[in-house]
Amino acid sequence: MLIPSKLSRPVRLDHTVVRERLLAKLSGANNFRLALITSPAGYGKTTLISQWAAGKNDIGWYSLDEGDNQQERFASYLIAAVQQATNGHCAICETMAQKRQYASLTSLFAQLFIELAEWHSPLYLVIDDYHLITNPVIHESMRFFIRHQPENLTLVVLSRNLPQLGIANLRVRDQLLEIGSQQLAFTHQEAKQFFDCRLSSPIEAAESSRICDDVSGWATALQLIALSARQNTHSAHKSARRLAGINASHLSDYLVDEVLDNVDLATRHFLLKSAILRSMNDALITRVTGEENGQMRLEEIERQGLFLQRMDDTGEWFCYHPLFGNFLRQRCQWELAAELPEIHRAAAESWMAQGFPSEAIHHALAAGDALMLRDILLNHAWSLFNHSELSLLEESLKALPWDSLLENPQLVLLQAWLMQSQHRYGEVNTLLARAEHEIKDIREGTMHAEFNALRAQVAINDGNPDEAERLAKLALEELPPGWFYSRIVATSVLGEVLHCKGELTRSLALMQQTEQMARQHDVWHYALWSLIQQSEILFAQGFLQTAWETQEKAFQLINEQHLEQLPMHEFLVRIRAQLLWAWARLDEAEASARSGIEVLSSYQPQQQLQCLAMLIQCSLARGDLDNARSQLNRLENLLGNGKYHSDWISNANKVRVIYWQMTGDKAAAANWLRHTAKPEFANNHFLQGQWRNIARAQILLGEFESAEIVLEELNENARSLRLMSDLNRNLLLLNQLYWQAGRKSDAQRVLLDALKLANRTGFISHFVIEGEAMAQQLRQLIQLNTLPELEQHRAQRILREINQHHRHKFAHFDENFVERLLNHPEVPELIRTSPLTQREWQVLGLIYSGYSNEQIAGELEVAATTIKTHIRNLYQKLGVAHRQAAVQHAQKLLKMMGYGV
C-alpha cells in the first residue's frame, strides 16, 4: 500500500513569494529531457517547483525518503506517479510494479516507454529529494530512463547535490535545464516581498537588501529572521548578522535558541515527537503526541511558520521541511531519549491501524521492540514477501532474537524462503535443520510439512531429484488441504521429479494439477512454471503441436498477469525457439532466442547460455559456419565461467559436436570425448541428449561399434519411456552411423522409421542438420517413388531446406563447375558437342536434388511451361528419356568430378 502523501505535490501557500524570474525560465521545461534544481537545504527548491506545477494536470510528483533506496519501493512509487500524471494510462506497468513482475528497473522502464508511446501530450515527472538515493542500481536505471524517455516527457529532479544521472552528456547535447543555488537565492526585490508578507510592520527596502546580502539570499535564513522578528526576541538585522556566513550544517544552535526556546513546552514536545514521522496526518499525530485534535494542531504549527508544509490538496498530510525535520529528530534523541521507544511504538501502531505495515516495521525497528516487530511480521510478512519487500523482511528478521523465531516457526520458514529466493540453498537446509533440532515437536504436523515442501524445492533446484521426491511426498502426506501454497510447491516438485525420471504421463498430470491449483489461488509464477513443464513434456512425447498450444496458453498468461519480466519468460521463449527450429522456421526461432536474451539482459551473462546455444543451432541449420564459430567462442567462454545444470551442458555440447562434425574437427571431438560426463542413466531428454552427443563424436572418430551400442540402448530407453522426440533424433543419428559404415540397407531402414515418426513430431531441421549424406539418401528414396504421401512430401521439404541453406548439389552446376566439366578428359562426347545452356545445367542440378517441375519453376521464378521446355531440351542433349535417367547421368558426372555421391 502506497502512502498518498509521497505522491502529492506540495500545496502552494498563500504567503510565499512567487519567483517570477525562475518560473519564466521553467516555462520552457518541456523542451528539455531533464530539469535539474540543485542547492543545499532551504533554498526553496520544492516551493519553486510547486509554484511552477500549479495548474498543470499532466504531472506526477514523487517525494523520496531514505526507504526509497529499495528498488521495488522506488519502482512502485515512480510508476504510481506516472499513473497520476497520465490518469492511469500505463496499466500494464502499474500491475507489473505492484506484483513485482519485472526483471529489473530498466526492463520495467522499457515497458513504461512502450505504453507512453501512445501518450502524445506533454508530460512531467517530478522527483523531490533525489539526494537521498544512494543505491547505484537506481542511479543506473535513472540514467537509462533519461536516455530513452519519450520526447514529450520532461523529468524534473530536485536534489541537494549533483545527481549521478549523466548530467555532462545532457548538458553538451542541450537537453538539460539547470537552476542552482545562485539562481535560487533571493534577490533584493524578492526579499522585500517576503518580509512584507511575513511581518506586520514593514521594513525599509535598504534594510531588507542588507539582510538579504548578509545571508546571501538563503530562503531558510530569511524565514528564521521573520520568525524571530515576530517573536520580538531580536531585531531582524541582528538575526541576519547572526545567520550570516553559516549554512545548513551549523544551524542547530541557532534553531534551538531562536525556535525551540521561544515556544511553550507543549509545542516544543509536539514538535519533537511529531518529527519522528516522515509524513503525518491527524490520526498519526493524535496517537504519537497525545494531542486530541491532531489536524488542528498541525494547522496551528503551520500558521506559526514552523517549517511545516502540506503534502496534498486535501490538507490531510503534512511533513516538516527536511532541514527542520532532521534537526528536530536529532533534538528528540537528546531531549526525549527515554520516551523515544514508546513514541516509535505509538507511531507503529498508528501506521498499522491505517494499513501501512512497512512503515510500521520502520518504527518497530527504531523502537527496538522485538515483540511488536514479531507481531507485525506474523500478520503481514507473507504479504510483504509476495510483494518482494525482501530487503525490509531480511532486516526485520535479523532484528529478532533466535528464540523469537523458534517460538514462531512461520518466521523461520519465511527466513528460509528468503534464502531460497536468493539461491542460498545450503543455508536453507542448515537453518531448517537447526530449527527442527531446537523446536519441540516440530518434526510432526503442518509446519514440518511446510519445511519439507521448501526443502523439496531446494533439492530439485540443486539437482537432487531423489531427495526432492522423498520430501515432496512427505509434505503432501502431512499438509492439510487448506495449505495451498506449500501444496502447490510440493506438487510442482513431484511433477518435475517424474519428468526427470522419464515418467512423462504421470508428470504431465501433476503439472496440470499444479496449474489448476496455482490459477485458483493466484500463484501466477507457479502457474507459468507448470505450463512450461507441460510443454516440455509434450515435446518429449513427440506431441509438438500440443506443446505449441500449451505454450500459447503460457504466453496468454504472461500477457494477462504481466509476467514479461520474470526470468521464466526466457524459459518459455527458449522452448518456443526449439520448437520453431524443429519445424525449420529458423528466422522465427532466432528471433525468439534473441528475445530470451533480452529478457535476461540484466542478469549474469551465464544465464544466456541456453539461448546462445539456440542461436548457434540456427546458424548450423543454415550452414553458416562462420557465424556459428563466432558464437561458439562466446559459448565456450561462458561454459568455462559458470556452473550449469546437466540440461544446459547437454544443449551446449550438442552444438559444439555438430559444428565439429560439419568441419571435420576430429581433434576437438576426441579431446571432448575424453573429458565429458558420461551419465549413469538415459531416462530423460537431457540425459538422452548428452549420450547422443557422445555417439555423434564417436561416429565422427570412426568408432562405429561404440556409437551403435550407445544408440541402441538410447532407443530401447526412449521406446520404453515413450520419449518419441528423442527416438526420432536417435534414429537420424543411427542412420548416419550406418551410412558412414557402408551399411546402406540398415541406413535406409532407420531413415524410413525416422520419416514416419516425423509425421508425429513434425521434425525438419533435425534431418537438415545432417547435410549432404541425408540429401543423397532422400534423393534416392524420392527416385524410388515408394514413399507414402506424407513421407514423400516431408522428404522433398527437407531436400529444399538442405539445398537452400547448404547449396549442396545446386552449387555444383554453377559456371565454374561447368567450365571444369567441359574441359575434363572423360567428359561424354555428347555433352561436349551439344552443350547445355547455363539455365539447363541449373535445371539438371535441381532435378538431381529431388525438385518437382513446379518446385523448379518456383526456385528459378519462371513459368512451369518454360521449365518443361528446358527439361525436354536437356533430355535430348543428354540422350535420356526420363527423370530417373537424368538423375543417374548427373550422378555419374559428379563422381567423375570427384564428388562423393
From Swiss-Prot:
Known regulation of activity: Activated by ATP and maltotriose, which are both required for DNA binding.
BP GO terms, sorted: positive regulation of carbohydrate metabolic process; positive regulation of DNA-templated transcription
DNA-binding region location: 853-872
Record's keyword terms, sorted: Activator, ATP-binding, Carbohydrate metabolism, DNA-binding, Nucleotide-binding, Transcription, Transcription regulation
Presence of keyword Nucleotidyltransferase: no
Single Gene Ontology MF annotation: DNA-binding transcription factor activity
Entry-linked InterPro entries: P-loop_NTPase, Sig_transdc_resp-reg_C-effctor, TPR-like_helical_dom_sf, TPR_MalT, Tscrpt_reg_HTH_MalT, Tscrpt_reg_LuxR_C, WH-like_DNA-bd_sf
Record bears the keyword Iron-sulfur: no
Domain HTH luxR-type as annotated: residue spans: 829-894
Binding locations of ATP: 39-46
Biological role stated in the UniProt entry: Positively regulates the transcription of the maltose regulon whose gene products are responsible for uptake and catabolism of malto-oligosaccharides. Specifically binds to the promoter region of its target genes, recognizing a short DNA motif called the MalT box.
Protein family according to the UniProt entry: Belongs to the MalT family.
Subunit structure: Monomer in solution. Oligomerizes to an active state in the presence of the positive effectors ATP and maltotriose.
Name the record gives this protein: HTH-type transcriptional regulator MalT
Organism classification: Bacteria, Pseudomonadati, Pseudomonadota, Gammaproteobacteria, Enterobacterales
Gene: malT
